[in-house]
């Protein structure tokens, strides 16, 4: 039986942190994107805001996959393991946006999780290992303090920024919506958009 906990339903439906932060997040994307590659497409909320020459979107959930196919009929939409998807579609002229699962409760409290890794930490470890080998530009997201992924982004050696939306959205889990971004795009603070 699916969880009846409000916080878990909220996480499965889409954590409001990224949903309410998306306009701030895309300001940190490269200006000219040839290939936009999104291995954790969800419902395409970020994709809606991206201008690119080509789009490649993936989600392992059957619901999200079908939703994306209908919403973006002219984009390449896949239902693959995220690693296989990245190896197939990420090229040196790609910008890869990764928003992997942030919360452990999704695993514990969701009836049929459409996840390919045993836990949240593994997503971050594998992404940080693979993305540099693909020679593309990328951003990975997480919750602001990374308490559930063991601070993998902060420890990665790549620049991190944390953004918080202070007005107009209400609180999520008792705090303002916020997101951490980690990327190979930024060299110094002046590059942070």
Features from the language model and the residues they span:
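Class I S-adenosyl-L-methionine-dependent methyltransferase catalytic core
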Residues: 1-193
């Amino acid at each position: 039986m699916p969880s009846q906990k409000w916080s878990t339903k909220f996480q499965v439906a889409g954590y409001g942190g990224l949903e309410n932060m998306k306009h701030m997040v895309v300001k940190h994307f490269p200006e000219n994107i040839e290939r936009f590659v999104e291995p954790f497409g969800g419902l395409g909320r970020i994709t809606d805001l991206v201008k690119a020459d080509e789009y490649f979107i993936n989600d392992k959930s059957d619901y999200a996959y079908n939703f994306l196919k209908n919403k973006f009929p002219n984009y390449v939409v896949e239902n693959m393991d995220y690693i296989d998807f990245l190896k197939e579609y990420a090229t040196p002229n790609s910008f890869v946006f990764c928003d992997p699962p942030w919360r452990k409760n999704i695993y514990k409290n969701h009836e049929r999780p459409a996840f390919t890794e045993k836990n949240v930490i593994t997503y971050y470890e594998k992404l940080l290992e693979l993305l540099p080998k693909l020679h593309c530009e990328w951003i990975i997201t997480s919750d602001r303090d990374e308490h559930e992924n063991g601070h993998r982004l902060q420890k990665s050696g790549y620049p991190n920024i944390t953004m918080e939306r202070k007005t107009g959205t209400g609180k999520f889990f008792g705090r303002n919506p916020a997101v951490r971004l980690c990327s190979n795009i930024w060299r110094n603070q002046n590059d942070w958009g």
